[in-house]
């Protein structure tokens, strides 16, 4: 019976009211990162691409793949 009382006393002393606060405890402990590091990481991202830049590369690659597939079919 004393084990239960000790566990209960520890729970009450922790200030937590249930599992709802468990996530908050984890987020607070992991938020110790440096904001300067975050700024440097965000500055390194390249988000200024011209519109359709990737689409043009993909479509030309897909077109060459389709052309090779059609050539293989015609040879067979």
Curated annotation (Swiss-Prot):
Location of region: Disordered: 49-76
Q: What does the entry list under GO cellular component? A: cytoplasm; nucleus
Expression sites (tissue/organ): Present at high levels in skeletal muscle and brain but is present at lower levels in heart, testis and liver.
Q: Work out whether the entry's keyword set contains Hydrolase.
A: no
| Keyword Acetylation assigned | yes
Q: Which InterPro entries match?
A: cAMP_dep_PKI
- According to the UniProt record, list the residues that bear N-acetylthreonine: 2
| Site annotation Important for inhibition: residues | 16, 19-20
Q: Which GO terms describe its biological process?
A: negative regulation of cAMP/PKA signal transduction; negative regulation of protein import into nucleus; negative regulation of transcription by RNA polymerase II; regulation of G2/M transition of mitotic cell cycle
Which keywords accompany this UniProt record? Acetylation, Protein kinase inhibitor
A Pfam family of the record is PKI
GO MF annotation: an example: protein kinase A catalytic subunit binding
Function, please? Extremely potent competitive inhibitor of cAMP-dependent protein kinase activity, this protein interacts with the catalytic subunit of the enzyme after the cAMP-induced dissociation of its regulatory chains.
The UniProt similarity line reads: Belongs to the PKI family.
Additional comments on file? The inhibitory site contains regions very similar to the hinge regions (sites that directly interact with the enzyme active site) and 'pseudosubstrate site' of the regulatory chains; but, unlike these chains, PKI does not contain cAMP-binding sites. The arginine residues within the inhibitory site are essential for inhibition and recognition of the enzyme active site.
Q: Indicate what this protein is called per its UniProt record.
A: cAMP-dependent protein kinase inhibitor alpha
Which organism's genome codes for this protein?
Mus musculus
